[in-house]
């Protein structure tokens, strides 16, 4: 276990006065329970740094007071909601963990204006369950239904299965209540004018770009305590969906309306796969569009069987032939709309020499349908080895995304061959097009590994840098691997010096550096001092032995 700094008596006493004795602790056993999360850790340690204390506020006013106490005593703090991955935890020693689990209310569901007002600890599955009672649905990012709805739209990034209909995570916040890094309160959009929560912009220039940009500040720029999020029509779905079991053992006790179906589409090439995506977007149809990964499918549902199948050359080749797979779903408002959309997708598939399987004829239809809409399957990426990382994933026109998938597959194969990653035939690319007609989206290259094999730590990091080198060399855009620790020092000068603007925002909003910025960016003065010392850990020659890289 890492050594830990414990908060001193005076600030602890002041925080205790705000929260009460039962809602703050510096007991090492309690603090240890917040350090368990190794996923996407900045270091290669199995634990993240243990917090100096854990505080559990219940109101915005209590959050403000905690933040002001931290500023007064020059203590850093980090807020988390549901705590998926290490972004919500401290990135260094001596940080107070603000655990927002007591702020867990769905305050309002506005059926007419189609939005919900939530606090930080409301997870996506909770909001979806309540929204469905009103014939509505929410966007759930690929990380799964366990994630915080507020955190995913204010502080991180993400796309979910329904992104063609419900958009990208960062496009879903409306009015926001924001405790700034110094403890002052700022309401963004209409709540700032006392006009409700239906809009996140104005009057005047919007602050949403400063608040989150593309990737969010991951807790490095204060604390978000309330947020209105968009809701979307979810036509003809029962208000409650009874079932038994969980995940792959799900046994539904309901029947879907005939206006809902999902399909497997198999194409002969990436070119046909891409053309189908563009045609779907141009036709303005669909509720789900996403690449299916046959290599990962067996790993998620049956990891032991996958090892046997992939060790059999004949079976491996058969499975590989289904690589160019699209998952597509329709949710029609009426019988006529459903019939129209199904007619269109059949024509698109035929014109691109592809085949389509109607999953409604299979006994697993309801279970798989629910797994997609609930976004439960991505969480199963932990099954084969207990951990994974992701790379590529630039949000670009879909043809560029497919190019990332091709290159990412070749790079990942090298690291499968050397034992870094679990063999999934290098086919674990996930993503789709966003927002219907836009035809932009992302495809990220997910790599699963066994954390019990520590000797792969170095090559895992090397892989992330290799994929980033590829995005630079081939002008593929700013991908998910570009968000890793200190990548802004590399990518910033290549992209309009965005890192300088971000660090100036950090310094202006957080002059004391109180909001832990380990997963964000340091203040401008600190950043400038460190820029000259930065050396890339991995050089571009890491790509030299990637087979057929330029094909």
What does each model-identified segment do?
Residues 14, 18-42:
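Conserved oxyanion/phosphate-binding beta-strand-loop segments in alpha/beta enzyme cores
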Residues 24-28, 56, 77-81, 98-100, ...:
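General beta-strand structural signal in soluble alpha/beta enzymes
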Residues 38-138, 149-161:
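Long, structured ligand/cofactor-binding scaffold of large enzymes
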Residues 107-109, 118-120, 125-268, 546-551:
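FAD-binding subdomain of flavoenzyme oxidoreductases
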Residues 212, 228, 239-248, 257-268, ...:
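C-terminal cap/substrate-recognition region of VAO/PCMH-type FAD-linked oxidoreductases
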Residues 241-243, 253-268, 324-326, 382-405:
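Short glycine-/aliphatic-rich beta-strand segments at the starts of folded cytosolic domains
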């Amino acid at each position: 276990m890492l050594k830990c700094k414990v908060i001193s008596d005076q600030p602890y006493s002041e925080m205790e006065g705000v929260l009460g004795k039962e809602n703050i602790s510096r007991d090492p056993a309690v603090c240890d329970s917040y350090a368990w999360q190794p996923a996407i850790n900045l270091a290669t340690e199995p634990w993240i740094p243990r917090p100096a204390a854990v505080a559990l506020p219940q109101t915005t006013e209590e959050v403000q007071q905690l933040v002001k106490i931290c500023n007064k005593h020059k203590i850093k703090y980090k807020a988390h909601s549901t705590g998926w991955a290490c972004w919500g935890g401290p990135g260094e020693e001596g940080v107070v963990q603000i655990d927002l689990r007591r702020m867990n209310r769905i305050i309002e569901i506005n059926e007419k204006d189609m939005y919900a007002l939530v606090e930080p600890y409301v997870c996506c599955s909770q909001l979806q369950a309540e929204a469905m009672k009103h014939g509505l649905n929410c966007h759930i990012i690929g990380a799964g239904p366990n994630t915080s709805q507020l955190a995913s739209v204010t502080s991180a990034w993400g796309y979910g299965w329904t992104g063609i209909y419900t958009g990208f995570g960062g496009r879903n916040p409306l009015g926001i209540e924001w405790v700034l890094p110094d403890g002052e309160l700022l309401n963004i959009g209409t709540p700032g004018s006392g006009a409700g929560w239906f809009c996140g912009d104005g009057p005047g220039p919007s602050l949403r770009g400063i608040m989150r940009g593309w990737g969010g500040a991951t807790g490095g720029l204060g604390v978000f305590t309330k947020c209105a999020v968009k809701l979307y029509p979810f036509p003809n779905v029962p208000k409650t969906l009874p079932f038994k079991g969980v995940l792959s053992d799900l046994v539904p006790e309901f029947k879907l309306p005939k206006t809902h179906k999902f399909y497997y589409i198999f194409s002969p090439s990436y070119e046909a796969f891409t053309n189908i995506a563009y045609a779907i977007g141009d036709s303005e149809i669909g509720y789900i569009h996403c690449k299916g990964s046959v290599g990962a499918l067996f790993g998620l549902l049956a990891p032991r069987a996958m090892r046997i199948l992939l060790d059999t050359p004949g079976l491996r080749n058969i499975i590989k032939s289904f690589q160019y797979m699209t998952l597509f779903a329709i949710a029609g408002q009426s019988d006529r709309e459903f019939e129209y959309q199904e007619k269109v997708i059949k024509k698109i598939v035929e014109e691109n020499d592809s085949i389509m399987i109607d999953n409604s004829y299979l006994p697993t239809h309801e279970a798989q349908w629910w797994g997609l809409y609930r976004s439960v399957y991505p969480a199963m990426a932990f099954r084969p080895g207990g951990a994974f990382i992701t790379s590529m994933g630039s949000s670009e026109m879909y043809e560029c995304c497919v190019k990332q998938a091709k290159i990412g597959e070749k790079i990942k194969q090298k690291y499968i061959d050397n034992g870094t990653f679990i063999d999934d035939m290098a086919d674990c690319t996930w993503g789709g097009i966003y927002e219907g007609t836009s035809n932009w989206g992302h495809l990220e290259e997910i790599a699963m590994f066994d954390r019990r094999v520590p000797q792969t730590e170095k090559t895992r990091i090397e892989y992330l840098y290799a994929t980033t080198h590829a995005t630079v060399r081939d002008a593929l855009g700013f991908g998910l691997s570009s968000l890793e620790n200190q990548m802004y020092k590399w990518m910033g000068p290549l992209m309009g010096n965005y890192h300088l603007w971000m660090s100036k925002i950090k310094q202006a909003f957080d002059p004391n550096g109180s909001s832990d910025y380990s997963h964000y960016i340091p203040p401008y003065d600190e950043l400038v001092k460190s820029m000259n010392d930065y050396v890339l850990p991995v050089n571009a020659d890491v790509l030299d032995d990637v087979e057929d890289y330029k094909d």
